[in-house]
Amino acid sequence: MVPMNRNHSANDIIDDMTTTDNTNTERKPVIHNAGIGLMGWTYMHLVKPYVFHTEPDKLHEQMVSFCKVAEKIPGLMGLLHLFTEVESGSLERDIMGLHFMNPFGLSAGLDKTGNLTTCLDSAGWGFETVGTMTGTYSKGNPRPWYHRLPEQTALMVHAGLPSEGAEIVAKRASSAKRKHGMLLFGSVGPSNKQYENQLDGMIDDYLKAFDVINTDVGFNGIEINISCPNLQFGEPFTDAHNVNTLMDEIAKRQINKPVMVKCPSFMNANELIPILDVLAAHAFINGVSVCNLRRDRTGLQIPDDWLGNISGLPTQECNENAIKLVRKNYDDRFVINGIGGTITPDDALRKLDEGADLVSGITAFMYRGPQMMAEWKRALIHREQK
């Protein structure tokens, strides 16, 4: 029994219940398994029907608003942690000089405003990538930003890097409470607007955002997003020469933390090699996130008037080919964050087997529910115990 202390908050009391001691070591797995199962059942049978009958743009706004309120309710974050945390030393990783509680994280794109950090930390995520954040305010594309493709376990995305600006978003995310060791990365990119000189203007915006995250002690790492297929005024950083120009400018900085680069998705993974060669030549780059949204609609039933690119299961094959290509051609030069089409626990484990050091997801959050992270971790523990 946890003694009541008038100086303890409700969150503190529940956190005390989750610490390892002789009285609760055997009880914790039972609580966690029951909590994960209950959350999964509740999501699939009660929440998901509402999710799939709500306009996706509106649903995203409601989710952010819910998380902002939920983290302020006494005891709720502690209860979330109690139900979902799956603890094991076998999950922990030391990568890029950082200690990850587990190798699974949230990709950039869902938490554009930095409002989900406390909830994700409480739910046991290993890391979160906030953003993408732009150097200056970026309105993004005209609505709608999202369309669901349930038959294909996918989502059409046409947001176009909306951002309040890196200074505002970074301050919000880095000041959020993180009591359970989740690491925080900041994704940086260019504002979605036309410049007098498009390449120079975009690079300048990258640098503004980079400088904010680089100097913010609340962030553990930086992800440079060179894959922005929904920008209205072109995507120059699918060209290796332009990537080199951008990286040369960033290399002039005094870089204070690990740097990843989020790469574009190609149906033929070999098209990545010129970009990877450029990245490999810049010593400050620690790793790559492969890969972003799929552009090619071949074989997919998508209305012609739906703008955007594809997230979810249809990205799986080409992005996993990219993971294998990076590991085969560059050995241990890059830390690999595998993203794209990671829906089930088996998908997450397969990416690790193919050479990824870290695995991120977004679309599974909608199709599987918020307990997905606990399911991934539990699957990894079970496999390593065999």
Q: What do these predicted ranges mean?
A:
Residues G131-M182:
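A gly/proline- and charged-residue-enriched helix-loop-helix capping module
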Residues T129-T136, G287-R294, T342, A348-E375:
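Glycine-rich phosphate-binding active-site loops on the catalytic face of alpha/beta enzymes
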